[in-house]
């Protein structure tokens, strides 16, 4: 629940249950994935549904590999949508310092931001991420480069990186997908959230592209 709060994932509790769900998570990107994982790890007995307009990870493939040009896939791009979002086909670099990557430290404080990064990193390790970290153990080189950067009016941010690589990132996310399914999370792929069901200021559910709610 705290990861959901930090990353702003759409986290909906349903009172009118027409999909046999207590909780709907819209989007199976990192925020949605970690929300579902956190609920399971905290012993939630709620029926969880994830709604994702892209495909399951094992069914995602880009035709550009064969055609050499973007085919503008419809209804959605296989690279940017689907389980784990664009991260599944990235080079899998995880920045492990709160000084880079956004304004989370400003919003919640540096200590809590770093604790959250460390917590998420441990989960990646549990699912098979490489234990080696780049960017550590070169203190003297970093010191010299930082001194040169200061003279040039620049700020050097020393950030450790866990580099999974494209294939390993794919395997890690596939393992997480199977874990969620095996632990009862129901996934609606190729399904888009079209609208919210509102009662005053309270969200009671969602309307989906397949007609369900």
Where does each model-flagged region fall?
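Gly/Ala-rich phosphate-binding loop of Rossmann-like dinucleotide-binding domains
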Residues: 36, 40
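Beta1/beta-strand and adjacent pyrophosphate-binding region of the FAD-binding site
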Residues: 19-31, 49
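Core beta-strand elements of the Rossmann-like FAD/NAD(P) dinucleotide-binding domain
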Residues: 20-21, 209-213
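Conserved N-terminal/central alpha/beta ligand/cofactor-binding core
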Residues: 53-186
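Short beta-strand "acidic-cap" motif of Rossmann-like dinucleotide-binding folds
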Residues: 46-52
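A conserved short coil-to-beta-strand element within the FAD-binding core of flavoproteins
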Residues: 189-202
